């Protein structure tokens, strides 16, 4: 991942990943090559990417020193 040596998943993010059937590798792929990036609420960052023509994964994270702390993961159907 560009600039991130470590990725830490908070419990809420893990719950959402389990709920949506998204694994760590899919989250990492969104961070490595997002289709879109920006600023989310509370000065957090987001990265999102289409996994298929109809499924969008959005990753909400905080940026630390060489670390991305994953706060939440969302799956949206388009």
Give the label of every model feature segment.
Residues 1-78:
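Ribonuclease/tRNase effector modules and their secretory precursors
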